């Protein structure tokens, strides 16, 4: 039996909707990264963008275990001497763009190359419950019910 290698004609992209409310951030990011890569498909081909389009809603209500909400830091550098800056996860989640926490978590689980950048364009994250992709008729994936460890109440 020959090894199957997908061609662009074989790729069929679906739309998947995930509600992040109460879901643990790392577990959500792992599931989303695998869907974006296409590793959940039997026709997975490593060098092609096989993954589905993923819509994440309620990103501002994502949970973190332990003290990560207060202790986890997101660093950047201004380019000037002594210009290292940081914000905690709590500051980002309570700020103007809380969806960036989810985007960063998924981005850091995807390959850091041109294919990874292409796969990240298939991710849409929204802080609230509304999204403009109803016309695509996304199928709902309930991450919270996949494993009891995927949720955290407090």
UniProtKB/Swiss-Prot annotation:
Keywords, ordered alphabetically: Ribonucleoprotein, Ribosomal protein
Highest taxon of the lineage: Bacteria
Pfam families per the UniProt record, alphabetical: Ribosomal_L13 (PF00572)
Gene Ontology CC: cytosolic large ribosomal subunit
UniProt keyword Transmembrane present: no
Cystine pairings recorded for this chain: none
SUPFAM superfamilies in the record: Ribosomal protein L13
Signal peptide (residue range): none
Similarity comment: Belongs to the universal ribosomal protein uL13 family.
Protein name per UniProt: Large ribosomal subunit protein uL13
């Amino acid at each position: 039996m020959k090894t199957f290698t997908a061609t662009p004609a074989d790729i069929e992209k679906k739309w998947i909707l995930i509600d992040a409310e109460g879901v643990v951030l790392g577990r959500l990011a792992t599931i989303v990264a695998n869907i974006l890569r296409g590793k959940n498909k039997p026709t997975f081909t490593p060098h092609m963008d096989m993954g589905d389009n993923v819509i994440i809603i309620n990103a501002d209500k994502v949970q973190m275990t332990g003290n990560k909400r207060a202790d986890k830091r997101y660093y950047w550098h201004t380019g000037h001497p002594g210009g290292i800056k940081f914000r905690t996860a709590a500051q980002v989640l309570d700020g103007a763009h809380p969806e960036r926490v989810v985007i960063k978590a998924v981005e850091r689980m995807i390959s850091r190359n041109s294919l990874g950048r292409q796969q990240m364009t298939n991710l849409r994250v929204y802080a609230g419950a509304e999204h403009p992709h109803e016309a695509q008729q996304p199928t709902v994936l309930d991450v919270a019910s996949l494993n009891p460890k995927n949720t955290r109440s407090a």
